[in-house]
Amino acid sequence: MEKLNKNVFSAVQPSGQLTIGNYIGVLREWILMQHDFTCFFCIADLHSLTVRRSSAILKNSVLDVVATYLACGLDPCKSVIFLQSCVHEHSELHWLLTCCTYYGELIRMTQFKDKARKNSKNINVGLLSYPILMASDVLLYDTDVVPIGLDQKQHMELICNIARRFNLLYGNTFKIPKNKMSYYGSNILSLSDPTKKMSKSDVNENGVIFLLDNLSSVKKKIKLAVTDSDNPPRIRYDKDTKIGISNLINILSCFQNRDISDIEKEFYYYSYQDFKSVVIKEIVNFMTNFQNLYFSFRKNEDYLEKILSEGSKRASWYAKKLLKKVKTSMGLF
């Protein structure tokens, strides 16, 4: 089947292990989209520099992400898988867009305000200008669609505002991308505190299932997952009064590719313990297959580096054309 004439861009930072929430909300969507669109899937190592880490850890983390991409089902023949820092046009466009962005816009970003409040004495400029680099990432590939979670909605609005402003100042240069909201990924919640999103930075690891977790640890985490005190227990989806069980129903529906209503009908009378056993079986089955593939790819670093090298060359070919168009619009040589 021929691909649609549309470009997709998305990225993941090489910072910490990915979770089943990342898989459901991000990677699973990518796998489906690669068959129908021209997809640019970036490993955003420049973004990760806002947090200090050793160079050895960063390099290993990059290769971990490539192996994760492949193990989840991304095909380097169907998608452009590349490293952000290897395509220098990202940094150059970042500066050009910085000159079209207002300070007030950046300090209003919710993520920046949250991080500044938590660590007010150690805020670097990179954290403030993070959304502008994100804009250069997206706009550099004539992007039509950006799959995002709810937490990136404000950044996407800023990216579109920057693109429109540039077009008004210098002529029609950038496409205005549309975001594709991931309902599921934004709604995979912590197992231990289902009022919060499942996050790889959660201090309570019992609330998070990492893709590389030991399988016995996965079983334990799900067994300990918060439910409710209904008597008799009922497997029913209700985000207001049964948030813990609703989270487990959501997870199971994603891994089984079934409607939530189907899950409710089949398991309505199950005990919470028995329902958790069903969830455990489904996740462990997925993770067993994933981890076998992951470790097979991860031990072949030459192959992973080759994918990055070839993908970065392909990305650079697209990026050079767009950057030339931008510079011509601005009167730069």
UniProtKB/Swiss-Prot annotation:
Per the UniProt entry, the Enzyme Commission number(s) are 6.1.1.2
Q: Which CDD domains match?
A: TrpRS_core (cd00806)
**GO-annotated biological processes:** tryptophanyl-tRNA aminoacylation
Q: Which keywords appear in this protein's UniProt record, sorted alphabetically? A: Aminoacyl-tRNA synthetase, ATP-binding, Cytoplasm, Ligase, Nucleotide-binding, Protein biosynthesis
User: What is annotated about its quaternary structure and interactions?
Assistant: Homodimer.
Family the UniProt entry places it in: Belongs to the class-I aminoacyl-tRNA synthetase family.
Q: What is this protein identified as?
A: Tryptophan--tRNA ligase
Protein encoded by which gene = trpS
